[in-house]
Structure formats: C-alpha cells, structure tokens
C-alpha cells in the first residue's frame, strides 16, 4: 500500500499489536 495511507496504518497497527 504505497498510496493508501489508511490501509498501511491499519497494517502497522495490527503488526504492532502482534509485536506487543
């Protein structure tokens, strides 16, 4: 998702949750 910022934000949030 280079253009979709919302999609990337959600993916990063989900990854952060799995990391923590």
Curated annotation (Swiss-Prot):
Pathway: Energy metabolism; oxidative phosphorylation. One of its GO terms (molecular function) is oxidoreductase activity. GO terms for cellular component: mitochondrial inner membrane. Keywords: Membrane, Mitochondrion, Mitochondrion inner membrane, Oxidoreductase, Transmembrane, Transmembrane helix. It is found in: Mitochondrion inner membrane. The keyword Zinc-finger does not apply. It is a single-pass membrane protein. One of its GO terms (biological process) is oxidative phosphorylation. The keyword Oxidoreductase applies. Liver specific isoform. Component of the cytochrome c oxidase, the last enzyme in the mitochondrial electron transport chain which drives oxidative phosphorylation. The respiratory chain contains 3 multisubunit complexes succinate dehydrogenase (complex II, CII), ubiquinol-cytochrome c oxidoreductase (cytochrome b-c1 complex, complex III, CIII) and cytochrome c oxidase (complex IV, CIV), that cooperate to transfer electrons derived from NADH and succinate to molecular oxygen, creating an electrochemical gradient over the inner membrane that drives transmembrane transport and the ATP synthase. Component of the cytochrome c oxidase (complex IV, CIV), a multisubunit enzyme composed of 14 subunits. The complex is composed of a catalytic core of 3 subunits MT-CO1, MT-CO2 and MT-CO3, encoded in the mitochondrial DNA, and 11 supernumerary subunits COX4I, COX5A, COX5B, COX6A, COX6B, COX6C, COX7A, COX7B, COX7C, COX8 and NDUFA4, which are encoded in the nuclear genome. Belongs to the cytochrome c oxidase subunit 6A family. This is Cytochrome c oxidase subunit 6A1, mitochondrial. It comes from Canis lupus familiaris (Dog).
């Amino acid at each position: 998702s280079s253009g979709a910022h919302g999609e990337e934000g959600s993916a990063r949030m989900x990854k952060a949750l799995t990391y923590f």
